[in-house]
C-alpha cells in the first residue's frame, strides 16, 4: 500500500476497521462493517463516504463559458449560478473521456469534479483543447478533500452542525462558504447513491475533524461510515454509470443510454459529429439491465450469449442488497436488447439464463 496515493483520512480508516484496497492507484476502504450493512444504512438512514480521491479542476476567465460549452455534451446555457450540471466530455469519436459535475459560480468561473482515475487525463485533455480561448485551467485536486453524506436522514444529521438552512440548497444546487462544525465548506445537494444527500468539499486539513463530527452526530440516526463497495452497489441499483464499466473512451453516452445529457441543439461541441452520425445510423450496441433466472452472480467482464454466440459482456453485476436478486448491466448487440428477451451469462464456463429488464432497478429518492 506504500506506493498508493492516500486521502487525508487514510489514518482514520484503521480506527473504523476499514478494509483497504487499491482503487485506481488510491488506498481506499472497500468496506468498514460490511458492504450490505453500509448499503442498507444509506437506503434507510445515512452513510458517510470519503470521496477525497475525486478530482477538482477550476476553469476561470473571460471565455470560460464558451470553452466549456465546446468541451462538454450538456448545455451550459441552461445552468444558473450556484447550480450543478452532470455531463460528459467526449473525444472526437464520441467515446467518453470522462463523466463529471460542473459547478457554476458565474460565466467566468466554474468548478469541475472528475473521476479519480481520470484526473491527469482530463486535465491534459482540457489543456490540449484550450486553443485560443482566454481561460485559466487549474488542477486543485491535491488541495481538496471531499466527504459525501447520503441517505434519507442526511439533511437532518448535517443540519445539526450548521446554521445554514440546508433545505434551501435544492437538488443539483450548491452553496459555498457554508460553516459546518465551524469549517468553511462548499456543499452541494448531489450524490452517487440514488438517495438524497450532500457532497462536501473542504481544504485537506479539516477532513478528519469534519468526518469525526458527522459520525458523532449521525450515530443516533443510524449513520454508518461506508466504503467503495457500498458506493458501487448503491450507484448500480440506481442505474448510475461507473467510468470504466458503463462509460469509456470506446463506449459513447448514447450506447450507455444517456442521450438526455447530450444536447445536439446547443451548437458545436467535441464529439458532436460522431454522436450525431451514430444516432442517425442507429445504435449497433447498447447497455441493458438484466436479472438472472438461473442461480449465479454476474461479474464485470463476463461473456453474454444468445443463440450460441457471443453478443456482448457484463459491465457491472451484483447480488442487489435492496432487491435481493442477482442483477446486472451488459453492453450487448442492439438486436438482442429488447425488454423481456432471454440471454445467457457465462459464469464459470457455464451459460446461465437471464432476462433483459429495465436498467432502473431502484427508484431514486431525490429531494427535488
From Swiss-Prot:
One of its GO terms (molecular function) is aminomethyltransferase activity. It catalyses: N(6)-[(R)-S(8)-aminomethyldihydrolipoyl]-L-lysyl-[protein] + (6S)-5,6,7,8-tetrahydrofolate = N(6)-[(R)-dihydrolipoyl]-L-lysyl-[protein] + (6R)-5,10-methylene-5,6,7,8-tetrahydrofolate + NH4(+). The keyword Transferase applies. The keyword NAD does not apply. One of its GO terms (biological process) is glycine decarboxylation via glycine cleavage system. Its EC number is 2.1.2.10. It holds the Pfam family GCV_T. It is an enzyme of class 2 (transferase). InterPro entries: GCS_T, GCS_T_bac, GCST_C, GCV_T_N, GcvT/YgfZ/DmdA, GcvT/YgfZ_C, TrmE/GcvT_dom1. Keywords: Aminotransferase, Transferase. One of its GO terms (cellular component) is glycine cleavage complex. It comes from the Bacteria. HAMAP family: GcvT (MF_00259). Belongs to the GcvT family. The glycine cleavage system is composed of four proteins: P, T, L and H. The glycine cleavage system catalyzes the degradation of glycine. This is Aminomethyltransferase.
